[in-house]
């Protein structure tokens, strides 16, 4: 009994030390490595999204992968825009020569009004300049408005190769096919130009640093039939794939749904809320890993409006919350990759404490 009382303080101090060491340890995915840092539309928290400036900044900040969303021009060229409607991310509305191009289209069942990449040749798009999408939240980015053109996918691949030569490290690319059924329906499918460019720049096998992602199912299955490049099935918290009426993303995240995804894809891309609920991890990461799928979550942003309540800081003068704390919490679920508008800060959040 006396020995037990004597040992209690030692045991207590040892437990505290172990807890401190665990908290200081780097966050690791189940693979034993830190989660990949995927620059969401480039370093889009600091530069207008989907510009060469945003991608280069992300690479310079140490991102493992950069993510270009891909749409097509009228002459079949892949360019980087989050949507094919470009009124909110370019100066097209200030070009009177294109005023008559404004139109209303039905895309994935939704009516959208604006200017669309498929109505412009690449040469015409070259006359436009990018603008900050989230100007109210990121006013500092607006100083870069009208400086950068819309890049082609090939220009992005050339940038990656140039930065690899400069830095001596491999830099991954993570393209998303945007609205593939819609584009195929108007005679502008993604698959052939996408695979041709990737092959031209040396991306041909599952060992190469590339993931192709989509919210749809059919184009991923078609890609799997002709390529071994790694594929990611994107999912959302609501709705379902535009090309699979009657199927919901919730259905796809059941054990059976994950098994079906594993037949054609190498991983899933859910929103962060699907892996980390307010009460704790949801178990989705474990279920996905059990069927051999990687998990790459989107999107970590610094602003309070994008963070769960527990990680918000309402009094912050820049409107930013506890981004580092949230990044660590998400990484702690065992995810294999994390999309972020702020790749440098995401990387720093996962570094071990000194």
Language-model features: locations:
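N-terminal secretory signal peptides that target proteins for export/translocation
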Residues: 1-11
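Phosphate-group recognition and catalysis centered on beta-loop-alpha active-site segments
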Residues: 2, 28-354
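Bacterial N-terminal signal peptides
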Residues: 13-25
């Amino acid at each position: 009994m006396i020995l037990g009382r004597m040992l209690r303080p030692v045991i207590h101090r040892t437990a505290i030390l172990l807890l401190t060491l665990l908290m200081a340890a780097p966050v690791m995915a189940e693979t034993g490595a830190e989660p990949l840092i995927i620059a969401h539309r480039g370093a889009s928290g600091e530069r207008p999204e989907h510009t060469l400036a945003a991608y280069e900044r992300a690479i310079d900040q140490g991102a493992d992968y950069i993510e270009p969303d891909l749409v097509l021009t009228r002459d079949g060229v892949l360019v980087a825009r989050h949507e094919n409607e470009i009124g909110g991310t370019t100066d097209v509305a200030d070009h009177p020569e294109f005023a008559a191009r404004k139109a209303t289209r039905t895309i994935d069942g939704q009516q959208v009004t604006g200017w669309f990449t498929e109505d412009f040749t690449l040469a015409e798009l070259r006359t436009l300049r990018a603008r900050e999408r989230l100007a109210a939240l990121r006013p500092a980015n607006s100083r870069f408005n009208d400086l950068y053109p819309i890049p082609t996918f090939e220009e992005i691949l050339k940038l990656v190769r140039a930065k690899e030569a400069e830095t001596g490290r491999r830099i991954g690319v993570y393209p998303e096919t945007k609205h593939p059924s819609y584009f195929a329906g108007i005679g502008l499918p993604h698959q052939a130009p996408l695979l041709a460019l990737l092959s031209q720049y040396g991306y041909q096998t599952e060992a190469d640093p590339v993931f192709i992602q989509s919210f749809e199912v059919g184009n991923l299955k078609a890609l799997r039939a002709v390529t071994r490049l790694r594929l990611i099935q994107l999912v959302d918290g609501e709705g379902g794939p535009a090309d699979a009426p009657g199927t919901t993303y919730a259905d796809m995240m059941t054990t059976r749904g994950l098994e079906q995804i594993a037949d054609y894809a190498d991983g899933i891309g859910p929103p962060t809320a699907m892996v980390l609920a307010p009460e704790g991890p949801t178990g989705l990461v474990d279920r996905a890993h059990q069927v051999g799928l990687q998990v790459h979550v989107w999107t970590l942003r610094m602003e309070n409006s994008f963070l769960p309540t527990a990680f918000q800081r309402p009094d912050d003068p820049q409107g930013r919350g506890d981004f580092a704390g949230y990044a660590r919490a998400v990484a702690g679920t065992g995810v294999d990759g994390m999309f972020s508008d702020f790749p440098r800060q995401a990387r720093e959040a996962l570094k071990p404490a000194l």
